[in-house]
A protein has these predicted regions:
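Beta-propeller-forming repeat regions
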Residues: 13-650
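Sec-dependent signal peptide recognition
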Residues: 1-10
C-alpha cells in the first residue's frame, strides 16, 4: 500500500468527521413512560398552552445542548379527574434564557425574564420581548467575596402586592456575594464564608396596571428583618389561609420551602417569621434534588393552591395542597409526585456519565450511568445482541446494601460549599474488580473518594454490597488534594472530585488497574498487585504522557475548578493500541502511540465530531450495540441525555 493511501486512512480515522452526526439515543419503545424531563434546570410554566381546556406544561431549560422553551402537551384531559397525566414528548417553542417566571393575573398569564415581558409566550416562547422599564441589574450586592458570581437567580413577577388595584413588580434575588464560590472550609469542616441570601424586593406601582410607574424597590420584611431564604427565593404572594390577604411562599437553592404568613392586612401587608413547610406526616416538605423552582398553581382544580416544582435535573413535580392548615398556621402539602411523559430519548438526570456494559448477562450492551443526583441508573437493552438501534426499558436506580444507592455531599462534602448538599456527581466504570467473574462498579463522586460496589449476586441478577474504599498501598499517610479539609482513612484513595475512574489492565498482567487523575490533576497509573493474597493498588505513577513523554496534566486548576475530567480508554482506531477519549466539545481523541521509554504516550488529535454538545462537560463512553466488535461513541451530556456516534472506521 502506498504512503499517500496510508496517510488518507490515518486522516479518515483521526480527524473530526464532518459527516458524522451525534444523535440522541431513543427509547424505541412507544408504550414506555418515563420521568418528564428537560435538560439541566427546569423552570415550569403550567398553563393551558393549546387552548383545549386542560393544563399543559411549558418548561424553560437554559442549558446546553437542550436550551429551549419546551411544551409538554397533556393528552389525557382534565387534571381535576387525572392530576398525573402522561404527557406527550416535548415540542420546542423557542430558545430561552435564564429565570423565566410566569405571573397569573386577572387578565391572563404574563411571562417575564429580568427586565422584559414576553407576549404570546404560549405560542412563541421568548421570541418576542418588551422592556419593563426597570434595569435587570438594579440590585447591588453588599458582600465582598472575590470569587464566584455576585448574583445568580433573578426572578421577576407581577402581583398587586398592596391591594390598591395596580400590579406591582416583585423580584427575587439570589445573592452570592457573601458566600463566594469554593475552598472556604476550615480543618473542622466549617464553612468560613457567609451563606447564600435570597431576598424579595417590591417595586410599588404608583401608576396604573396599564401605565405603570414604579417606585424605588424595598425589601420585604418578616418580623422586622428582611425575608432571607438560602438562595433562589422564587417568591409567590397568594392567599394560602383564605383570610383575604396575600401570604408569601418561597423556595430556595436547596430542596425546601418557607412560608411567611401575612399577619397584617390586604392593604398593609406584614409578615410573620418564616416557617418551614411540612407534609401531613410531619416530615419536612422537600424535593428529591435541589435548585428548585416552585410555581403556585391550582393544578387539580380543587380550589386550593398547589405547587408545580422544577428540579435541577430537569424533572417537574406536582406538590398537592391538602387543603389543611397545620397547627403552626402553615399550609400542609403532600409529598412531591414527579410527572411522567411518553418515552422519547434516554435521559439520566443531568450531567450523565454513561458506561456501556452487559449488566444482566444476556449478551447485549446495557448502560449504567451516574448523574448530578449521585444515583447510579441501569438502562436495560431489551433488544438482545447485535441490534444497532435497541429498544430500552425505563431506568432503574441501582441498589447497594439493600437500599437505593445515592451519594450526596451533605452539609460539608462539596469543595464548593454547603449549597451543594444534595448533589453527588457519580462517575463510574463497570469491571470485575475482585476477579470473581462478576461485574462490580468502581465510582468517584462529589467527595473525591474512590470506592467500589461489590457484586455478590449472579451474572444475570447482580446484587451489590454497600460501598467500600479502594485499597492503596501507600508508604505513609494517603495524599489528598491541597484543598480537601478532611483526612482520608489509611490505605484509601482520595483524589480530585467528579473525574472518571478508568478500570483497565493497562500493563496486561491479568489484573485490572486504575487510571485516573491524581491529587494534582495528572493522569496517573495505579498498578494493581497482590499483597498477602489481597489485591491492592500501588501509589500513582505519572507515566501517561504526551507525544514527547511529558506527563499528561489534564487539569491544573484548584478547588472547585479541579477534577471534572471525564474519559475512557479504548482502541478507537483499530491499530491495537489504546487511545483516550477525553471530554471536550464532544470528546477529544488522544491517539495512543504505545509504550515508549517506560511511558504510555498519546497525541491529541481533536474532537470526534464537529457538533458541540458541551455544557458542564461531556462524559465519553463506548458501546457496541450492533455486535461488530468496533467501539462506537456514547457521550453523556449536561442535559442528561446520551449522544451516539457510529465509529467511522471500516
Amino acid at each position: 500500500m502506498s504512503a499517500p493511501i496510508n496517510l488518507f486512512i490515518l486522516l479518515a480515522i483521526c480527524l473530526p468527521h464532518n459527516n458524522q452526526t451525534l444523535t440522541e439515543l431513543s427509547y424505541n419503545n412507544i408504550n414506555q413512560s418515563v420521568y418528564l424531563g428537560v435538560g439541566l434546570w427546569a423552570w415550569p410554566i403550567p398553563c393551558d398552552a393549546d387552548g383545549d381546556g386542560d393544563f399543559d406544561l411549558i418548561v424553560s431549560c437554559p442549558d446546553k445542548p437542550s436550551n429551549g422553551v419546551w411544551l409538554f402537551e397533556n393528552a389525557t384531559g382534565n387534571t381535576k379527574l387525572n392530576p398525573m397525566p402522561v404527557f406527550k414528548p416535548a415540542r420546542r417553542l423557542s430558545s430561552t434564557s435564564h429565570y423565566v417566571m410566569p405571573s397569573y393575573t386577572d387578565t391572563g398569564m404574563r411571562v417575564l425574564t429580568p427586565g422584559f415581558e414576553h407576549p404570546d409566550f404560549q405560542r412563541t416562547g421568548l421570541t418576542k420581548r418588551l422592556p419593563l422599564g426597570i434595569s435587570a441589574r438594579f440590585y447591588v450586592p453588599e458582600g465582598t467575596q472575590p470569587k464566584g458570581p455576585k448574583v445568580r437567580h433573578n426572578q421577576w413577577r407581577l402581583v398587586d402586592y398592596d391591594g390598591d388595584g395596580s400590579r406591582d413588580m416583585i423580584v427575587g434575588i439570589e445573592d452570592w456575594s457573601h458566600y463566594g464560590w469554593d475552598d472556604a472550609w476550615n480543618s473542622k469542616g466549617e464553612w468560613r464564608n457567609g451563606p447564600l441570601h435570597g431576598f424579595v424586593f417590591v417595586f410599588r406601582n404608583k401608576g396604573t396596571t396599564e401605565a405603570p410607574l414604579y417606585d424605588a424597590p424595598f425589601k420585604v420584611l418578616a418580623e422586622g428583618a428582611p425575608v432571607d431564604t438560602f438562595g433562589c427565593p422564587s417568591p409567590h404572594f397568594a392567599d394560602f389561609d383564605n383570610d383575604g390577604d396575600l401570604d408569601l411562599l418561597c423556595g430556595e437553592f436547596l430542596d425546601g420551602f418557607t412560608y411567611f404568613e401575612n399577619i397584617g392586612t390586604r392593604r398593609n401587608p406584614r409578615y410573620a417569621s418564616g416557617k418551614r413547610l411540612k407534609t401531613a406526616t410531619g416530615t419536612a416538605l422537600a424535593m428529591d434534588l435541589q435548585m428548585i423552582v416552585p410555581i403556585v398553581f391550582d393544578w387539580d382544580r380543587d380550589g386550593d393552591l398547589d405547587l408545580i416544582v422544577g428540579d435541577e435535573d430537569g424533572r417537574v413535580a406536582w406538590v398537592e395542597n391538602t387543603g389543611k392548615m397545620g397547627a403552626d398556621h402553615t399550609p400542609v402539602f403532600s409529598a412531591p409526585r414527579y410527572f411522567q411523559q411518553q418515552a422519547d430519548t434516554l435521559k439520566c438526570g443531568a450531567l450523565a456519565t454513561p458506561f456501556g456494559f452487559d449488566w444482566d448477562g444476556d449478551g447485549d450492551t446495557d448502560i449504567i450511568s451516574g448523574n448530578t443526583a449521585g444515583t447510579i441508573e441501569f438502562f436495560e437493552n431489551l433488544s438482545g445482541p447485535k441490534v444497532a438501534n435497541p429498544k430500552w426499558a425505563a431506568p432503574k436506580q441501582i441498589k447497594a446494601g439493600g437500599k437505593p444507592f445515592r451519594m450526596m455531599a451533605g452539609a460539608n462534602g462539596s469543595i464548593q460549599g454547603p449549597a451543594e448538599a444534595k448533589w453527588g456527581y457519580t462517575t463510574l466504570n463497570v469491571a470485575d474488580w475482585n476477579g470473581d467473574g462478576l461485574p462490580d462498579i468502581v465510582f468517584n463522586s462529589i467527595l473525591g473518594k474512590v470506592e467500589w460496589l461489590k457484586n455478590v449476586g449472579t451474572r444475570s441478577k447482580p446484587v451489590l454490597e454497600s460501598a467500600v474504599p479502594l485499597l492503596v498501598d501507600w508508604p505513609g499517610a494517603p495524599p489528598k488534594p491541597a484543598w480537601t479539609w478532611w483526612e482520608p482513612q489509611p490505605g484509601t484513595l482520595a483524589t480530585q472530585w467528579r473525574t472518571t475512574p478508568v478500570v483497565i489492565d493497562l500493563n496486561q498482567d491479568g489484573l485490572p488497574d486504575l487510571v485516573m487523575l491524581d491529587t494534582e490533576g495528572y493522569l496517573a497509573f495505579f498498578e494493581r498487585f497482590r499483597k498477602n493474597s489481597t489485591l491492592h493498588l500501588k501509589p500513582p505513577q505519572r507515566i501517561l504522557g504526551d507525544a514527547k513523554g511529558n506527563p499528561l496534566r489534564l487539569n491544573s486548576k484548584t478547588a472547585g475548578a479541579s477534577g471534572r475530567r471525564k474519559l475512557c480508554m479504548v482502541d478507537w482506531n483499530g491499530d491495537g493500541i489504546l487511545d483516550i477519549l477525553l471530554n471536550g466539545t464532544n470528546a477529544d481523541l488522544y491517539k495512543g502511540l504505545g509504550k515508549i521509554d517506560g511511558s504510555w504516550r498519546f497525541e491529541k488529535v481533536g474532537p470526534l465530531a464537529t457538533q458541540n454538545i458541551e455544557g458542564h462537560d461531556v462524559s465519553p463512553a463506548v458501546v457496541d450495540f450492533d455486535g461488530n466488535s468496533i467501539p462506537d461513541f456514547l457521550g453523556g451530556a449536561e442535559d442528561g441525555r446520551f449522544y451516539f456516534m457510529k465509529n467511522p472506521r471500516p
